[in-house]
């Protein structure tokens, strides 16, 4: 009886896995790629390439006006959004993308980040324009308010809120927490239940402070850990400097001529690189997902354009810098060690960071866990 139940359980699990895999392949096929990249390109064109205002956006980080309505500073709102964006996907996820779609996926991920800046600009602008002030004086906003107040479609706004909450549990919590648990178990043999308990306690402690408490934690951890992680990547690239330009050329070749990590025909390999790269870009910077605009709505900023510029810089840090650095680091490691298979994303990432003497593995673990915690909070 027990064996029959066990076999039925595994068969159900295999069926569910196959169904989810087929659905994922359909979802990330040509229609969604065209719609997502098409939206990025369309907004880039009609807004006359807002990416060119990146330096102005960076300067606005330090402009603060406490007379503006809002709950947190514009810089803190960006840090909360980046906290939700910069997570396991920027570290382990890039390795998984390379394993699935080859090094060419790094280019498509990077391109999605650059073009996605226009979409995040639009999301930030609409978040400020259609936000509302609650009875307690706090600001609420996001795509659900844009859909309800801008398009006069309450049911669509409600549907967006429900599906966003569901996605938050999946890509925002379960995936991130699992990545941290696996890394801590691999590095320090910490049981998964212990990691889950600590993450739950930390999250509850910070969330008791409301949006201000979350913003304070994110405003400290996100820049601090991003700088440490970037310095670690730069060290690895310095050690493997002779492979940097070959790695970039390899990424570009794989993006257009097609050379998937697992092999296959050229056309299928290009499609795999595009699909995994664009998916990783969306998973990383959320440009087009809409959830990052919820944090933008809480900013002390009455000028929608100013907040839109600040919001648009998010994909730059998240995808153009961190994801691209990770991708180049991993590709240099592939070229430097051709005997090592690149079909195992997590192992490839661990190998790359082993180039940092003494602190390579702890640095990778610390970066991953910190980014995971900030993602769950964001």
PLM feature spans:
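Select transmembrane alpha-helical segments in multipass membrane proteins
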Residues: 33-38, 73-81, 153-167, 197-198, ...
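Selective recognition of specific alpha-helical transmembrane segments in multi-pass small-molecule
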Residues: 115-123, 197-211, 222-242, 275, ...
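Alpha-helical membrane segments and immediately flanking helix-loop junctions
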Residues: 68-100, 126-144, 148-150, 162-165, ...
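Helix-loop-helix module between adjacent transmembrane segments
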Residues: 39, 43-44, 112-137, 143-207, ...
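Flexible loop linkers connecting adjacent transmembrane helices
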Residues: 49-74, 96-106, 110, 118-151, ...
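Extracellular/periplasmic helix-exit of transmembrane alpha-helices
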Residues: 123-130, 232-250, 262-264, 298-301, ...
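N-terminal alpha-helical transmembrane segments of multi-pass membrane transport
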Residues: 1-88, 98-105, 116
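Membrane-interface loop-to-helix entry segments
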Residues: 35-42, 46-59, 179-184, 191-252
């Amino acid at each position: 009886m027990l064996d029959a139940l066990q076999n039925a359980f595994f068969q159900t699990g295999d069926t569910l896995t196959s169904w989810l895999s087929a659905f994922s392949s359909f979802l990330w096929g040509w229609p969604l790629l065209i719609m997502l990249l098409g939206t990025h390109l369309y907004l880039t064109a009609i807004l006359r390439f807002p990416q060119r205002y990146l330096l102005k956006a960076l300067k606005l980080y330090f402009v603060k006006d406490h007379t503006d309505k809002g709950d947190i500073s514009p810089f803190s709102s960006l840090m909360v959004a980046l906290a939700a964006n910069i997570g396991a996907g920027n570290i382990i996820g890039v390795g998984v993308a390379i394993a699935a779609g080859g090094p060419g996926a790094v280019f498509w991920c990077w391109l999605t980040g650059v073009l996605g800046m226009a979409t995040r600009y639009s999301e930030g602008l609409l978040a400020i324009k259609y936000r509302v002030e609650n009875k307690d004086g706090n600001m609420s906003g996001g795509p659900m308010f844009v859909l309800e107040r801008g398009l006069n479609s309450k049911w669509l706004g409600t549907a967006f809120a429900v599906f966003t909450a569901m996605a938050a549990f999946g890509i925002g919590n379960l995936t991130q927490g699992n990545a941290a648990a696996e890394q801590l178990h691999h590095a320090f043999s910490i049981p998964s239940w212990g990691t889950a308990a600590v993450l739950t306690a930390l999250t509850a402690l910070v969330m008791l402070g409301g949006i201000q408490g979350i913003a304070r934690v994110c405003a400290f951890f996100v820049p601090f850990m991003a700088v440490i992680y970037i310095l670690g990547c730069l060290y690895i690239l310095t050690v493997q400097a002779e492979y940097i330009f070959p790695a970039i050329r390899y990424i570009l070749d794989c993006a257009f001529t097609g050379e998937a990590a697992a092999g296959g025909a050229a056309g299928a390999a290009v499609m795999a690189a595009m699909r995994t790269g664009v998916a990783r870009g969306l998973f990383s910077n959320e440009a087009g997902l809409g959830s990052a605009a919820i944090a933008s709505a809480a900013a002390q900023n009455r000028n929608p354009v100013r907040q839109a510029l600040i919001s648009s810089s998010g994909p730059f840090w998240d995808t153009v810098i961190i994801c691209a650095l990770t991708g180049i680091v991993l590709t240099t490691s592939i070229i430097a060690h051709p005997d090592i298979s690149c079909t195992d994303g997590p192992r490839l990432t661990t190998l790359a960071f082993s180039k940092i003497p003494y602190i390579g593995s702890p640095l990778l673990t610390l970066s991953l866990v910190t980014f995971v915690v900030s993602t769950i909070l964001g």
